[in-house]
């Protein structure tokens, strides 16, 4: 990690991922920020030397308004393909409207999410997606899986206990407020086990009545009793 004179994170360097954060630094097309807001970010991942990134703009209350995508160190190649725009906030600072852009076909890019969000206090109650296009291939987008006034529920600690957009009927928690069981509307279940320090030790997926077990032992991950992978810093 690299830092500037204000101790703000400036860069992350590794064999598989590199990232540079810009604040008041000049990068073509950005608006320098002297208050700690990030004005731009560049990154590259894997063996590729191709850089991608975003320029950011903020409103008068330092709330993000736009994330403007581009490629190369000038962010001038393939511009706007994966832009994001926050269209409105409520008085508490909660996001009310969000536009996301992405790949809509093998050669086209456009709007993939047009989200309207409603709240009870600061707790999200429902999300409606008015976008007409879906993301291409295996890209990520919001999946509008429900059309109800209340699509999310919470317990007294503020933990999420229901998410109808993800088809989750019930989420149960242990005494450490860590999720212990997730029950889906189709009857499938995910169960979690933890150590006394909160570290996750086991995950059990029960899918169509068939159980698969994943155990976490330090940097070793086992699936159904067989070593699956060893985690290490490349």
Each predicted region: which residue ranges?
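Short secondary-structure transition motifs
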Residues: 5-14, 91-119, 172-234
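Short, ordered secondary-structure scaffold segments
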Residues: 19-52, 58, 118-166, 210-234
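Short, surface-exposed coil-to-beta transition loops
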Residues: 50-52, 82, 112
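Short glycine-/Asp-/Thr-/Trp-enriched loop segments that recur within the blades
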Residues: 74-82
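Buried hydrophobic residues that stabilize the cores of well-folded domains
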Residues: 1-3, 28-29, 84-86, 95-97
């Amino acid at each position: 990690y690299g830092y500037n004179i204000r101790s703000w994170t400036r860069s992350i360097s590794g064999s598989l991922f590199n990232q540079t954060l810009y604040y008041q630094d000049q990068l073509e097309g950005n608006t320098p920020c002297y208050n700690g807001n990030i004005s731009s970010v560049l990154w590259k991942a894997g063996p590729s030397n191709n850089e991608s990134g975003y320029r950011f703009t903020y409103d008068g209350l330092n709330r993000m308004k736009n994330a403007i995508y581009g490629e190369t160190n000038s962010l001038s190649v393939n511009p706007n393909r994966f832009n994001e725009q926050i269209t409105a906030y409520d008085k508490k600072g909660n996001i009310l409207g969000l536009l996301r852009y992405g790949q809509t076909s093998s050669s086209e890019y456009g709007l993939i999410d047009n989200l309207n969000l409603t709240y009870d206090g600061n707790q999200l109650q429902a999300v409606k997606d008015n976008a007409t296009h879906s993301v291409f291939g295996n890209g990520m987008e919001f999946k509008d899986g429900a059309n109800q006034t209340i699509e999310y529920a919470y317990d007294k600690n503020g933990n999420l206990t229901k998410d109808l957009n993800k088809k989750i009927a019930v989420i149960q928690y242990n005494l450490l407020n860590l999720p212990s069981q997730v029950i889906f509307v189709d009857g499938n279940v995910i169960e979690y086990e933890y150590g006394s320090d909160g570290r996750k030790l086991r995950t059990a997926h029960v899918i169509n009545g068939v159980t698969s077990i994943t155990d976490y032992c330090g940097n070793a991950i086992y699936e159904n009793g067989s070593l699956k992978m060893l985690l290490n810093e490349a």
